[in-house]
Amino acid sequence: LPSAKRLAERYGDRAPLSLVMGGLHCGTQVPLEDGMKERIRGHWARVHEVTGQPFDEAFFERASFVYDTGPSCRAVVAARRVAPECALPVLERLHQAFYAENRDITDEGTLVALVAEHLGLSEARFGEIYDAEETLLETYGDFELARELGVRGFPTLIARKDCSLEVLTQG
């Protein structure tokens, strides 16, 4: 996300950024097992070394946490429906809440409260947008587009010029 933010700040007037949600662990219904927690811990350690991103490791003490990214993807799409320029800041806020603050952003109430506050909307109003069928369909559309583009890791930055696409970074 830091590279996407820098690109948006530096080139946004000439090369607008479109945020597409990929659904990394969307629809997961099984709690994380210890082996998966260790893989995630290792990944987080590497990310921290490279980016300085803080992580709250209390996350790994959750006994029956189901790591479903679908709700957070839907929240970002809902924010994008409110104001497209808010999608990246909302995604950043959700990452901060999850990784650095150990907030459960798989919980709809937590998500709605975080994003509504960030957008300056009432929870009721943002909840309506989040729950709308159009938001769900747009979220699934994002997942399909990511698959069509061949995205295999997150985040992925793809540059488009005319009709050609080039992967700049992946994962």
Question: Where are the regions that the model predicts?
Answer:
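C-terminal cap of thioredoxin/glutaredoxin-like
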Residues: 1-11, 15, 93-171
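Structural alpha/beta surface segment adjacent to cysteine/selenocysteine redox centers
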Residues: 2-97, 107-108
